[in-house]
């Protein structure tokens, strides 16, 4: 039986608003392209080098762009200011961009190269990866992917289109530059906010004598930050051979080659920071089963520390939309997904854990302790 229909009779104002909303949703990709342009032109770094604020003519000069491009750069900057990527004094909608003073804000600060700050992780490669041709093509193939009757385990649209999974050894065979950008982008993304986590969730490390940090791209950055704050912790970084071979040397941690699915070096705690969202629920259970084998009982302080996006509208609609977009990024390009608290609870139970605690919600992410 067909569902009962409710006739929609929009007013004139609603129709015009609907058309404007359709424009926005259909053309949002141009905001991403404008951001990519700004990153490739090194606009955030140029503004930083000019003292953190600049006019459009000075920016054109600093970037060594033809003066004929000034009005076009003004239009790009106007969009990026409106989108919250830069701040501006004096910019308005009447085209008077040349009189505006453009400034960095917290978002564009993350795109400045060479900032000396423990809390700064250069995010250029995250941007370049997510708007790369291979990612975009995978997104454009979504409808075709839905129509195909594919055998399980289902390949991602990226894998279905390009023939290789993302962030895998075979990705390099598809495109070496893509592989490099993805590795750099994931590393930058994963290591951002480790200082915030250490400051706001220090209790998760207090009393630990050993920690296995699992499979972060260039995971030594986060692991080293933890050891610096808690020097009594003996930290082992578990990673794939190809990652360890290219990672910078670090005397503060011990690096071990291995595989999450087979064995994890024993420790009082195992830490998985932005790892599990790459994997299916079934694979997450297998990984967590290995984690459970690697730690002692809860009475002896055994636990798994998980830092992942925790899907939910608890931080408001803008942060929730960002979480959902990250979930779409996973759906299009990997076999993984972002998860709600209920999703995590079911996975923890299947992996044989007795309890868990959400220590804190930090931005889009949750810090979770899971107990054997």
From Swiss-Prot:
Quaternary structure and interacting proteins, as annotated: Homodimer.
Keywords: Methyltransferase, S-adenosyl-L-methionine, Transferase
Family, per entry: Belongs to the class I-like SAM-binding methyltransferase superfamily. Cation-independent O-methyltransferase family. COMT subfamily.
Biological process per Gene Ontology, one example term: biosynthetic process
Keyword Cell membrane attributed: no
Signal peptide: none
Entry EC number(s): 2.1.1.-
Residue positions of the active site: 277 (proton acceptor)
The protein's name in its UniProt record: Probable O-methyltransferase 2
Keyword S-adenosyl-L-methionine: yes
GO molecular function: O-methyltransferase activity; protein dimerization activity; S-adenosylmethionine-dependent methyltransferase activity
Short name of one Pfam family: Methyltransf_2
Recorded superkingdom: Eukaryota
InterPro entries registered for this protein in UniProt: COMT-like, O_MeTrfase_dom, Plant_O-MeTrfase_dimerisation, SAM-dependent_MTases_sf, WH-like_DNA-bd_sf, WH_DNA-bd_sf
Reported function: O-methyltransferase of unknown substrate specificity. Not active on resorcinol, orcinol, guaiacol, eugenol, ferulic acid, p-coumaric acid, catechol, caffeic acid or monomethyl ethers of resorcinol or orcinol.
Binding-site list for S-adenosyl-L-methionine: 216, 259, 273
Tissue specificity comment: Expressed predominantly in root hairs.
